[in-house]
UniProtKB/Swiss-Prot annotation:
Name of the protein described by the UniProt record: Recombination-associated protein RdgC
Entry's family note: Belongs to the RdgC family.
Molecular function in Gene Ontology: double-stranded DNA binding
UniProt function note: May be involved in recombination.
Coiled-coil annotated residue ranges, if any: none
Species: Shewanella loihica (strain ATCC BAA-1088 / PV-4)
Lineage: Bacteria, Pseudomonadati, Pseudomonadota, Gammaproteobacteria, Alteromonadales
GO BP of this protein: DNA recombination; regulation of DNA recombination
GO CC term (a single one): bacterial nucleoid
Length: 303
């Protein structure tokens, strides 16, 4: 339930979501396991996992969705060795060299033969659709995986007018100024981790972890032109995270004190607790995004 990373997109055209219509749209793209000949399958699954009953979990016009991916694990080395053995056998029997086209056909045949015996692995990715702040937050550190989920959602809905979140002023310029002044704008506080990078290829990258960022050693790198591309921050007393210059938010962690707000919810009803946690997380993520947009100088105008 609790998101661990954020890849953020914003709507660049008006967008409204009707829970019932969204549920119906996703139903046509529900996840189903791989058959014996499938290399991978990707589709929507229950938003709240085994405890849930729907593909979309909504509250206060905030919508949680989940997609499941199953992939067959067929090591390329296994296919390569089987192919080499088969090619050697045929070339010896027929006393000739096989053409590339023939080898490609053999490779496909071998893959088809091996797939039913291959192990598979599953992964899930969640996203939070937030019309009130015109954003979609994807719980992934990988833009590629986030785009894969959005592509599936776009296919289900017919259209999805979103673009990656970007700001009027480069994030690295803002973070560099914060570090120079040893002060992040409220309600954010700098922590003890940063990554500094030079604009030139020769300048290199310097990483600091568990270190006082006000020390001269750190500031010296700023004086020679390096900029801050990653900075660990706290949002009030609720969230710790690392903000990146590409607007990615990594290692998102909600504090124990914040999560304890729902301790009074009965543990005898796990679904009720999940619902309460969803509401709590959604509200705080909205507050986080609104504050980030404000202190970073506003979002870049849509094209």
């Amino acid at each position: 339930m609790w998101f661990k990373n954020l890849t953020v997109y914003r709507f660049n055209k008006p967008f409204s979501v009707d829970t019932e219509a969204l549920e119906k749209s996703l139903e046509d793209f529900t996840f189903s396991p791989c058959s014996s000949q499938d290399i991978s399958k990707f589709g929507f699954s229950k938003a709240l996992g085994k405890l849930g009953h729907t593909l979309v979990h909504s509250a206060e016009n905030r919508h949680l969705i989940c997609a499941t991916k199953e992939e067959k694990i067929l090591p390329s080395q296994v296919v390569k060795e089987a192919l080499e053995e088969k090619v050697a056998q045929i070339e010896a029997e027929e006393n000739r060299k096989l053409a590339k086209k023939e080898k490609d056909a053999l490779k496909e045949e071998i893959t088809t033969t091996l797939l039913p015996r291959a192990f598979s692995r599953r992964s899930q990715i969640h996203a939070l659709i937030l019309p009130e702040i015109e954003m979609i937050l994807v719980d992934s550190s990988s833009a590629t995986k986030a785009e894969e989920l959005l592509a599936l959602l776009r296919k289900a809905l017919g259209s999805l007018p979103v673009i990656p979140m970007s700001f009027k002023t480069p994030i690295e310029a803002q973070l560099t100024e914060w570090l120079k002044s040893n002060s992040a704008p409220a309600p954010f506080e700098m922590q003890d981790e940063a990554e500094l990078k030079s604009d030139s290829d020769e300048g290199g990258i310097v990483r600091f972890k568990q270190q006082d960022l006000t020390e001269n050693e750190v500031l010296a790198h700023l004086e020679v032109g390096k900029q801050v591309h990653k900075l660990a921050l706290h949002f009030g007393q609720s969230i710790a995270f690392v903000l990146q210059s590409d607007a990615g938010i990594k290692r998102l962690k909600f504090s124990e004190e914040f999560r304890a707000h729902n301790d009074e919810v009965s543990t005898e009803d796990p679904l009720a607790r999940l619902d309460a946690d969803f509401a709590l997380m959604g509200s705080e993520l909205i507050a986080l995004m609104n504050s980030l947009v404000e202190v970073l100088g506003g979002l870049e105008d849509s094209l």
